[in-house]
Amino acid sequence: MEADWDELSRIPVPPPSPHGLPTAATTIAFDDVSELLWAGNEFGRITSFYGPELQRYTSVRAHPVSDGPVRQILFHERGVISLSPKSVHMITRRGLTQWHISHEEMTDLYCMSLTAQLNKIIVAGCQRAMFTIDIDKGIIVDKLHTDHNYTLMKKSRYLCAATDTGSVNALSLTDFRVVKSWKSHGTAINDMDARNDLLVTCGFSVRHLGSPIVDPLANVYDLKTLSPLPPIPFHAGAAYVRMHPKLSTTSFVASQTGQLQVVDLMNPNAINLRQANVSFMLGIDISPSGEALAINDAECSIHLWGSPSKIHFNEMSKEVEFADVVPRPPPLDWSPDTPLNMIGMPYYRERLLSAWPSHLVFEVGSPPAPIDQSLIPYLRPAEMGHYAPNPKKTRRYQVENTRALTTAEPALIAPKFLSEKAREQNKFKSEASVSDTAEALAGAKLNGEAEDDPLLKYSNVEIKYSRFGVDDFDFRFYNQTTFSGLETHIANSFTNALLQLLKFIPLVRNLALHHAASTCIYETCLLCEMGYLFDMLEKANGQNCQATNLLRTFSSYREASNLGLFEENLTTKSLSSAIQSVNRFFLNQIAHDFRMIVPSSDDLDQRLSTIASESIRCMFCQNEIVRPGNSLANELIYPAIDIKQARRNPAFRFSNILRASIERETQNRGWCNYCRRYQQVTIRKSIHRMPLVLILNAALSNPICRRLWSIPGWLPEEVGIAVDNGQVMCFEGDELKTQLQNKLPNLVVYELVGLVSEIDIPEHQKPHLVSFINVSISSRELEAKNRWHLFNDFLVTEVDKDEALRFNQPWKSPCILAYQAKDARHAVDDSWKNVLDITLLFRDWSLNGGRAVETRQTLTEEEKPTPGTPVALDTEFVDLEKAEIDVKADGSQEIVRPSKSGLARVSVLRGSGVHEGVPFIDDYITIKEPIVDYVTQYSGIKPGDLDPRTSQHNLVPLKVAYKKLWLLLNLGCVFVGHGLASDFRKINIQVPKSQTVDTQYLYFHPGKNRRLSLRYLAWAVFKEYIQEEPADNNQGHDSIEDARMALRLWKKFQEYEDAGIVNQILEEIFREGSKLGFRPPPRNGVATVLSRPGTAVTMQNSSGRNTPSTPDVGGAATATATTSAPATPRQAFRRSIALTPSNGTFGGPGAGDFFGGSPLK
């Protein structure tokens, strides 16, 4: 080892699979033919690395996982030979398999070596048979009996073989008889090497403490005279050794802690020391040239040592083959204006394939059927491919028509749009029409064919979009209950079923809402988002909702992306395993978010956490470590099942499986600090306290266990759990009733709140998730009757308990179960509304340094909103994704997915008081997602306005802006605006109609079938111009101006109501609008203000900006569509004291007597 030797490269050992964790290499070896370093792992995979940079070259699964780890790699001119406990495998250096040999007597192979015949190798191990294998033919040519268990082999003058008792046998290279034997070490030989006439060994011996430790001596033997030589002292413990390939008496000796020693065997005093930067060394190897040294450590890394100027693996290496470089096509000057005839066509003399005659087209075999994704977890490797149990989704002798379309029509046909129903309303008698939803969910096909279809309500549901957008879709077709469903067409919306389940667990719901009402403003707080979602679902009262903000927060977690929990990763894993992984992530993140505000986690632990301790005991030295083993989600562990005894054997009852899963005991390989190596360890959990909410992952990975669930009544509605001195007792059925009568101490009875199931109907191919929930548990009414509901995204319907808990259908599989303590039934806590932390409304919050905002004046404590306080609201949005439109062959267009918008600006104005009309919120929202269009001419948002580095506005995260609106909502404020339904949907907040005043519906004439734009209403009522055509694309709407105009229109409408002239005013507005096309006329310098029919007041115009008017959707469609939108019916409108008209003063910017002074007074 020269003076400039040092570590040149360090690489991690590649994981066994794309999503697996790295594991330490079990063996490493330098190739003696090419510049390659090879490594094997415990999963049977061998990987090669090229050159000093250790670039990955090939990676091959040489042995099945069931065969065990790769224990040795041997090289031949024709290829690379690897050995595992049960097989021998040979590949080319490019990774192509040459042969694979396994034998019934190959049970524990450890080592192999070349023999005197270079085309044969001998393999041996801790077994009574050795095998001679012909490398050229790939067959076993001889089987030899042996009385020794061999663990290492090295070829030199003799075949040196180490036994598992610490001896070394010198075997003849011809007949493999034992020529000489030495007792080299006390217990075992860890490593050895033989070259020319010398053999060096390292091993373990038992000292006075009784446990084996590394010997401080490396033993040396002369193979020429078959006699021992003086050993090499190595006080750090000689664990590994390699002989130098060129210097016959020089060897490398290494310790487990990384100390390297280069020593001359003939002169032990001449040594050279180095220290490798490793925590625990697992092996070394030296290259055939002697210029490189590889080190394998326990931290899953490979280190390469050598001289930077001289390093090479072989003296004469064969050139390593690499894939041919694909030639790049010549660049083309391609633009939208490039004519196609400039591209040109290649010259040809033969007939083109496109001219293939039709009479030569024949149908051959059908394409193979796609692999059922539900079988992936059950696949087992075989010699040829994999096999799995037959799911029996088709009848006997029935095959799949693979020539049919890959996507089947959904069983539940989408309803007609609301606009279509409105047009057809006059064609049919109302008595003859029956509720579409009742027909569909009762089993009648929507095409009129009365045919029972019990799978109808389990079908995939999809939202269809007309030219009027999502508002034209009839969600009530799918849900006529008071419980709201969740929409699809949102990234990661496959979690809808899990979110519904968590919402209906009262203790989880209370936890989320109390946290949302706290001081938390962390941008990525998942618990806050759950609180907002749960509040929205309750306020919606059966109207469809969407989890946009929560799923956006979920999508922002890098940990979730690394775990493959997002929708784009579902192609590689089953939906069932994905939602169970999401469940674990949600619970862990909830606990993390809760502790961010409340460091003491007693409340959380009492509700969700199983308090336990985990003991880890080494099976070799009996050393035991105890550590906390708390868990938020428990996975069911199933025993080995004989299905014939499943009904009679008590061990197969749900309660017993639950008990074994909670206090699980497993055996695994783990690191033992006392033994300083990986050993077999036993892991056992001791339970100290059970939570009030018990969430279980079904973990169905075995079709045999699936049959347990198909037993009627196997899943109980109630289970009892008692913890006594760390032991868990579970009861169900009559046994639970007996224990309740006996008043067993510490017994907690849990009732089933609901479960998430995977639905995989073969006819529809696309699996999805639904939830079955007992909604009575979270009801505020103390009703004793249980009512089960199916939540299939936005399809919600009541089902029988037996249907919810029945799993004897192959298309329905359980995923997640949720139990809650029966004492917490109806424990719905709304006290969070009384402890809302509203300090956010009274202080400035900014991401970009708290820049001064002249457009707003923050609320004071005296202006604290109270129920009924009016506030004017307007928002602006930018486009994050454009709409996805399908253009059909006839030229018609269908919206497949609407555009996705992001909230960019929120303006909220005072609606009453001295500072009426003055903004107290004017926030720009920073957006981390790519923005495809700022729509500046409509939104007024310019590039750079939402960037904290360049923005001149008050920037806040979406969480802060949303929480301000949520606080105003729950304080009882009344929101005044124009077109609020669209704004609320994009903001993702649910505002009850009683807290909404929308001027779009106030100024609506029932007989005119048209909604008026804010721009036209401003001119018609006040003769003012707003939203005028911008001079350039850098101008647009001003949300403060729009909100103030909506507030003024509402105030003026109240005056019309007080005077009793609403109908006359509306007639005049629509009469004038029909003449002008419902657009303000061009400016002429002077206009008249409409005060009452036939009366006019002259005033000067004010400036403003312009956007297109609301389009005339025409017909009865508009009238029908308005019934589902938030509105304020004039007949039912009751004005509180806070909603009284203005006193004629206005203290905001641009003051004027616009809020009063009406001639009507």
Curated annotation (Swiss-Prot):
Gene that this sequence comes from: pan2
Native species: Neosartorya fischeri (strain ATCC 1020 / DSM 3700 / CBS 544.65 / FGSC A1164 / JCM 1740 / NRRL 181 / WB 181)
Biased composition (Gly residues): 1145-1155
Protein name: PAN2-PAN3 deadenylation complex catalytic subunit pan2
Catalytic activity: Exonucleolytic cleavage of poly(A) to 5'-AMP
PANTHER family: DEADENYLATION COMPLEX CATALYTIC SUBUNIT PAN2, PAN2-PAN3 DEADENYLATION COMPLEX CATALYTIC SUBUNIT PAN2
UniProt family annotation: Belongs to the peptidase C19 family. PAN2 subfamily.
Domain USP residue range list: 453-822
Keyword vocabulary terms for this entry: Cytoplasm, Exonuclease, Hydrolase, Metal-binding, mRNA processing, Nuclease, Repeat, WD repeat
